[in-house]
């Protein structure tokens, strides 16, 4: 771990000192929502939470570096619609270990192993083991180490290896390079490659939750995940994360989960108060984005989904529209570009 962070620190300094944009005649950044479903429910074919960040040059269609942040159900299907295969990803980053953000990862690495069974390994970046206030250990490293256990126990890994010996005998986990870090209240560089620097910061939701910032010569994006305020209940100034606000200073784009105020306790939805209060409301996220000087706000993981209920909870006032989310963000004071996320919604910097 120590060697890793020494190396990262060196590359961070090198990245700044050399002006990484020199190697890109026309650098560009594309941020795409690979899944926008809020929570583990299924609705209208929405994929589980995930964001693809691509950086490069006009000549390579902004595709020199490809990073996947979270991998909810259906991630590989959405990536296929973008003509991005699992073998093309440089790294996967997890904000936290909830299944709506992770359950598509087994599919992703199984596909890499099936068709690229000798490597190279894929970097997986996530928090080190964290213990919750109730004593539960949240472990990304165990998640990745055991990602293919079901396929091993069923005999599939052995059967496929017997057909093609070039595949690693131990299955997909042997093609994962897990990089863990201890989340802190200050941004730290956790990954770097080809003019791209990724920083992380601790944020509240469950133990080990982290939010990320990607800086490139073409622009920057913060992936907030499901971050909320450290104070689990009111009184508090905002439901938004103060750490994410720190991370997002001057960033071009924020991608963040949101919950609409119609789900708040006492408004008839029946949603569990703890579940509502650990999410960031749309107006509070918008206010935070305004304070941080953000230009583009991409709403994702929306609770409730556009045009649907958040089962098993109710919407006494009726189903929400894209306009309802836009208005809630405007009510929070944000005057920049608002994107109410749908699967495969994309934003390119610079715009073409």
Each language-model region and where it sits:
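Intrinsic disorder/low-complexity signature
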Residues: 19-21, 298
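Bacterial N-terminal signal peptides
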Residues: 6-19
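Binuclear metal-dependent hydrolase catalytic cores
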Residues: 24-221, 233, 312, 316, ...
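Positively charged n-region of N-terminal signal peptides that target proteins for export
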Residues: 1-4
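Cap/insert and terminal regions of metallo-dependent hydrolase folds
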Residues: 207, 218-220, 228-342
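Conserved CoA-thioester-binding segment of acyl-CoA-metabolizing enzymes
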Residues: 224
């Amino acid at each position: 771990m120590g060697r890793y962070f020494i190396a990262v620190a060196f590359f961070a300094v090198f990245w700044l000192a050399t002006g990484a944009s020199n190697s890109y005649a026309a650098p560009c950044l594309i941020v795409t929502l690979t899944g926008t479903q809020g929570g583990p429910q299924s609705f209208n074919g929405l994929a589980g939470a995930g964001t693809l960040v691509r950086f490069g040059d006009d000549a390579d269609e902004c595709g020199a570096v490809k990073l996947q942040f979270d991998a909810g159900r259906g991630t590989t299907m959405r990536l296929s619609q973008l003509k991005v295969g699992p073998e093309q990803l440089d790294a996967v980053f997890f904000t936290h270990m909830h299944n709506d953000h992770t359950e598509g990862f087994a599919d992703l690495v199984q596909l890499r192993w099936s068709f690229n069974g000798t490597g190279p390994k894929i970097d997986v970046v996530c928090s080190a083991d964290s213990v919750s206030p109730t004593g539960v250990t949240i472990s990304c490293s165990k998640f990745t180490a055991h990602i293919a256990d079901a396929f091993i126990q069923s005999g599939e890994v052995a059967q496929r290896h017997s057909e093609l010996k070039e595949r690693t005998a131990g299955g997909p986990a042997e093609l994962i390079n897990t990089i863990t870090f201890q989340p802190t209240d200050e941004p730290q560089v956790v990954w770097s490659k080809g003019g791209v620097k990724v920083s992380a910061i601790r944020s509240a939701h469950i133990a080990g939750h982290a939010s990320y910032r990607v800086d490139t010569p073409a622009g920057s994006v913060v992936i907030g995940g499901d971050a909320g305020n450290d104070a689990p209940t009111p009184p508090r100034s905002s439901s938004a994360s103060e750490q994410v606000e720190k991370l997002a200073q001057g960033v071009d784009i924020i991608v963040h989960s949101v919950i609409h105020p119609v789900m708040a306790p006492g408004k008839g939805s029946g949603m569990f108060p703890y579940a509502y209060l650990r999410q960031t409301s749309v107006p509070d996220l918008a206010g935070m984005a305004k304070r941080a000087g953000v230009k583009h706000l991409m709403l994702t993981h929306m609770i409730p989904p556009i045009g649907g209920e958040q089962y098993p909870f109710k919407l006494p006032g009726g189903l929400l529209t894209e306009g309802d989310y836009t208005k809630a963000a405007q009510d929070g004071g944000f005057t920049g570009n608002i994107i109410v996320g749908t699967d495969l919604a994309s934003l390119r910097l610079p715009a073409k």
